[in-house]
């Protein structure tokens, strides 16, 4: 999914009609990607995670998919999350993916995520874990993500990741004690890369 208008290069006011329809019509996990370089050239992935992300039912599913990205690309994973969220990420990594190179940094205010701009380059991808309106980890600032990406991350590969969020947003039962658990290297295209991540 393209995050900018291909004619003007300016950010779209939304993520486009196709993905907007997908997000409004389904609570399944969605990944919107803007790739600057081939996936096989990436060496580092920064993951920005909002507070209370661990309460979403799709928490461990997207975390597993991020780990698969790290394994396929043999790259370093840097997680930035609230101090109450980090222990769930660390625990999962230690139990399921202890061989992956990873780092964990507290990010207790969502406004801090744009500072990751200082750590990005063409061999870096940033994954922004977001949420649909009405769910527990949603923040109003998420509505401006396409514009922020256009202004601050113009030369960086970016993924917006919407986790599984089941049921009506006003009536969902959230998992307050996260549970459950929810590849060849360097595929040639983004399409084949994501197919391997999601089906392996």
PLM region spans:
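Repeated scaffold domains used in trafficking and secretory/extracellular systems
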Residues: 111-115
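Intrinsically disordered or low-complexity boundary/linker segments at protein termini
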Residues: 1-91, 96-110, 121-125, 131-200
């Amino acid at each position: 999914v393209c995050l900018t208008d291909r004619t003007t290069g300016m950010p779209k006011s939304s993520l486009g009609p196709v993905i907007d329809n997908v997000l409004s019509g389904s609570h399944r996990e969605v990944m919107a990607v803007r790739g600057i370089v081939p996936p096989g050239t990436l060496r580092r992935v920064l993951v920005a995670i909002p507070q209370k992300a661990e309460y979403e039912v799709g928490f461990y599913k997207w975390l597993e998919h991020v780990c698969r990205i790290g394994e396929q690309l043999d790259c370093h994973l840097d997680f930035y999350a609230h101090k109450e969220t980090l222990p769930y990420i660390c625990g999962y990594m230690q139990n399921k993916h202890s061989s992956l190179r990873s780092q964990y940094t507290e990010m207790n205010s969502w406004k801090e995520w744009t500072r990751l701009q200082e750590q990005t380059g063409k061999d870096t991808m940033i994954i922004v874990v977001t949420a649909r309106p009405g769910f527990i980890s949603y923040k109003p600032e998420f509505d401006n993500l396409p514009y922020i990406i256009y202004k601050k991350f113009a030369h960086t590969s970016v993924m917006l990741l919407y986790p599984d969020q089941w049921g009506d947003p006003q009536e969902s039962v959230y998992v307050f004690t996260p549970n459950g658990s929810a590849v060849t290297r360097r595929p040639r295209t983004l399409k084949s890369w994501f197919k391997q991540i999601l089906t392996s």
